[in-house]
């Protein structure tokens, strides 16, 4: 059966006739709380006017922005007029008008709106300007996608890619008739960006805010400081940017990617002046987005300590801005000098950011320095604290009191709940950001603290979104689109009162492995669109297949906005299983099973070359009779819709394929008893911290393969995962022997191998040639070096072997 993918490429330059023919009339993300389709459509043309209440400056600004966007991208000029003004020439009373009409309707809340779209009139109702703004975001998504375009330059690039398309100078824009009653499920709908690890430009921040607004997010969490960089100007303490915004170099690749670690030798720097911060705050406010700044404390403080060493417990120690990722022992020392410094910093931050919340971090604070510090031990005794955990709580409480005294509220990561005691209570209005798992959120809600949910398993967009082997270098962990969409921020088991403290959820983008704008967008979208629906749409209205349907048109909007969104959803992956005759049967399936319901066209090659529109069309499972590198991609109308250079998988066919084996030493991980995982033809994979398809051993690897009959053989190849940062070393020696009866074995080869080999992690296939011989059984013993050799990252630690596919020929 042919799999075809209808991605609606024709909608790039959609005109009214084509648009009217589509059945996907309503492709709004996030899905409205209630949408009732109606017959017909309203047409925006040169006779349309937008009417706003007289002298309502905020609504006029919203209407002006809407009209300007339409004119810029379509050439249609829509005047914005006071509601009391005369109609345009040729307009009948109450026709071809978009009417902004404020109402008093408690059911809409402060962010809800009502849209009534008929062929003659659009009525927009809301109780606040914020509600009107969100109504306009919905109108954008009811209009043809060209309306949201980033501008003429990008339209030109689209025309270059699609020369047959017509420039988007349209005579009329259709909006399908409907009635929408809409408001958000949660009051806090956030997205986050870490600029400490990698710095991002003002232009990118504005684009990020634009995309957030289109998806009705209302809070931007700006992570401004970390061990690897201090990114905000503090006038009273200029060394924070003179020194703390600069690092001498940056680790290359994954944290565990090389042993020893490799650095690029290139200085890295960047920070935002206070004027630039004000510019971003104003821009966000124009999008009805509040910014929550984060100043990390007491941990993640190396950039600050490099700038001002006397804020540490060991001022004489030399500190440098961190050049690699991770958690560092050096943290702020809880001295009065440190608190005075932090109050100075927070005073300037509070003056820059008018929002209610100040995020103070509070996560991942090692306490070894505090345990060894005579000052800290005296402070614990003086304040009658029990231990360093309570000392952290004391630190957080001091900052909490200061921020509260300024009329603001703190947000902290869920570690701020630790070290609690009757005299170390947080202020009642302290808000907990739950990141490690949902338990912190449950605990905080039951203590009557407000909670923002952002658990890593649902909301960490630095995690990989597809097959680890196929994705760019990332932190690790798996977070596909479907998992994001499945999230319910309100944990089960909370009472109604406790559940009321769950303010919403937030998507986080930590940027250790995200150095560019393009990669940031790749990691964010479309997963952020899924989260937008999680936090806006009523739980009962969520529907993942319907979300995917709407997402197909939404991708076209993102194309117009020049967003480098991930096309992982369109990936198709080859998988293999052995056949009874020693070959492999390959299937090509979507990464997301829900995509089976949408039509697509998958093509593949078996010689390692990039698939094209002329490559073999996948219709049914096919047979591999020899080893091959398979690459896959999806196409529509001859154009790739997945990334043709992305999906690549090697398969091995040999005389051992599908053959049973016996392990004489038990493994420590992996499932060698299931589907013959060492002889199933599938090679192992690795990405981030994720490893699949290998079997690990703390002792020697000792295996006997039964070929089923006597065969002429001359070579054995074994795959090993060399990952010395995780103590997975190559063997020190490999012994191979053969047998006809499985009882009496004769040695054929003993080979020394380099167990001390470090360098780049990855799979190493070692080949052992022993000349032509006849055998049914092959015994392979790979000798473990037992302890990590000197010269590697963890010398003396127990070593393991990780074995991949076995090949016999």
List the predicted regions and their residue ranges.
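Bacterial Sec-dependent N-terminal signal peptides
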Residues: 1-25
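Short, compositionally stereotyped local motifs that mark structural "simplifiers"
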Residues: 20, 51, 542, 548-702, ...
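Contiguous, structured surface segment used for ligand recognition
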Residues: 21-186, 519, 534-545, 549-557, ...
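Feature activates predominantly on carbohydrate-active enzymes
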Residues: 106-357, 398, 402, 506-511
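Surface-exposed loop/turn motifs at beta-strand-loop junctions within extracellular Ig-like
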Residues: 128, 634-638, 784-786
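Active-site neighborhood of glycoside hydrolase catalytic domains
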Residues: 304-306, 321-323, 327-428, 435-443
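Flexible, acidic glycine-rich loops studded with aromatic residues
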Residues: 410-417, 422-430, 434-587
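Aromatic, loop-rich ligand-recognition surfaces of beta-strand-rich domains
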Residues: 685-749, 760-809
């Amino acid at each position: 059966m042919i799999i075809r993918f209808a991605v609606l490429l024709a909608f790039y330059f959609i005109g009214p006739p084509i648009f009217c023919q589509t059945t996907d009339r309503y492709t709004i993300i996030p899905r409205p709380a209630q949408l009732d389709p109606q017959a017909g459509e309203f047409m925006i043309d040169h006779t349309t006017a937008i009417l706003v209440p007289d002298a309502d400056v905020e609504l006029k600004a919203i209407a002006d922005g809407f009209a300007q966007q339409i004119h810029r991208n379509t050439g249609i000029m829509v005047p914005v007029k006071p509601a009391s003004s005369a109609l345009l020439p040729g307009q009948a009373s109450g026709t071809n008008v978009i009417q902004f009409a404020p109402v008093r309707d408690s059911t809409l809340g402060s962010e809800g709106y009502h849209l009534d779209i008929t062929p003659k009139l659009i009525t927009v109702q809301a109780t606040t300007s914020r509600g009107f703004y969100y109504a306009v975001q919905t109108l954008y998504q009811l209009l043809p996608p060209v309306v949201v375009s980033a501008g003429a330059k990008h339209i030109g690039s689209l025309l270059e890619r699609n020369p047959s398309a017509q420039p988007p100078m349209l005579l009329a824009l259709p909006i399908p008739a409907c009635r929408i009653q809409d408001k958000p499920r949660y009051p806090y709908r956030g997205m986050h960006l870490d600029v400490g690890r990698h710095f991002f430009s003002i232009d990118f921040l504005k684009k990020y805010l634009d995309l957030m607004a289109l998806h009705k997010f209302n809070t931007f969490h700006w992570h401004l400081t970390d061990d690897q960089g201090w990114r905000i100007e503090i006038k009273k303490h200029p060394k924070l940017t003179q020194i703390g915004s600069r690092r001498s170099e940056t680790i290359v690749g994954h944290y565990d990617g090389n042993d020893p670690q490799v650095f690029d030798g290139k200085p890295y720097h960047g920070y935002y002046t206070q004027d630039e911060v004000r510019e971003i705050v104003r821009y966000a406010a124009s999008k009805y987005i509040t910014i929550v700044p984060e100043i990390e404390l007491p941990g993640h403080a190396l950039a600050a300590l490099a700038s001002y060493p006397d804020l540490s417990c060991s001022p004489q120690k030399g500190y440098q801005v961190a050049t690699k990722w991770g958690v560092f022992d050096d943290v702020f020392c809880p001295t009065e000098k440190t608190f005075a410094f932090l109050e100075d910093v927070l005073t300037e931050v509070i003056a820059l950011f008018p929002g209610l919340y100040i995020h103070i971090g509070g996560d991942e604070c090692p306490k070894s320095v505090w345990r060894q510090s005579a000052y800290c031990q005296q402070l614990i005794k003086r304040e009658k604290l029990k231990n360093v955990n309570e000392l952290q709580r004391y630190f957080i409480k001091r900052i909490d009191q200061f921020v509260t005294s300024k009329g603001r509220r703190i947000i902290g990561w869920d570690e701020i709940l630790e070290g609690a005691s009757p005299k170390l209570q947080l202020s009642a209005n302290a808000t907990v950001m739950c990141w490690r798992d949902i338990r912190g959120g449950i605990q905080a809600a039951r203590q009557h603290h407000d909670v923002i949910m952002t658990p890593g398993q649902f909301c960490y967009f630095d995690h990989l979104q597809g097959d680890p082997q196929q994705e760019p270098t990332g932190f690790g962990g798996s977070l596909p689109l479907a998992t994001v969409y499945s999230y319910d921020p309100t944990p089960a088991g909370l009472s109604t009162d406790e559940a009321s403290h769950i303010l919403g959820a937030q998507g986080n983008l930590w940027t250790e492995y995200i150095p560019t704008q393009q990669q940031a967008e790749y990691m964010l979208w479309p997963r952020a669109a899924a989260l937008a629906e999680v936090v806006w749409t009523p739980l009962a209205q969520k529907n993942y297949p319907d979300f995917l349907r709407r997402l197909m048109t939404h991708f076209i909007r993102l194309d117009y906005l020049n967003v480098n969104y991930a096309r992982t959803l369109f990936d198709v992956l080859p998988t293999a299983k052995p056949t009874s005759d020693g070959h492999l049967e390959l299937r090509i399936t979507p990464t997301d099973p829900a995509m089976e319901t949408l039509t697509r066209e998958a093509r593949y090659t078996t010689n390692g070359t990039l698939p094209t529109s002329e490559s073999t069309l996948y219709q049914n499972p096919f047979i591999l009779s020899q080893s091959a590198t398979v690459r896959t991609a999806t196409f529509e109308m001859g154009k790739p819709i997945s990334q043709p250079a992305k999906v690549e998988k090697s398969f091995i066919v040999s005389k051992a394929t599908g053959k049973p084996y016996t392990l004489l030493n038990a493994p420590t991980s992996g499932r060698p008893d299931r589907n013959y995982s060492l002889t199933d033809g599938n090679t192992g994979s690795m990405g981030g911290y994720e490893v699949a398809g290998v079997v690990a051993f703390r002792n020697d690897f000792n295996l006997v393969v039964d070929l089923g009959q006597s065969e002429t053989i001359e070579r054995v190849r074994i795959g090993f995962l060399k990952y010395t940062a995780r103590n997975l070393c190559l063997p020190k020696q490999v012994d191979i022997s053969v047998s006809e009866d499985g009882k009496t074995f004769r040695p054929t080869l003993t080979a020394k191998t380099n167990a001390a080999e470090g360098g780049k992690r990855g799979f190493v296939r070692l080949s052992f040639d022993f000349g032509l011989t006849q055998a049914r059984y092959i015994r392979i013993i790979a000798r473990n070096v037992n302890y990590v050799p000197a010269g590697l990252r963890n010398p003396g630690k127990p070593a393991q072997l990780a074995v991949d596919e076995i090949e016999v020929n």
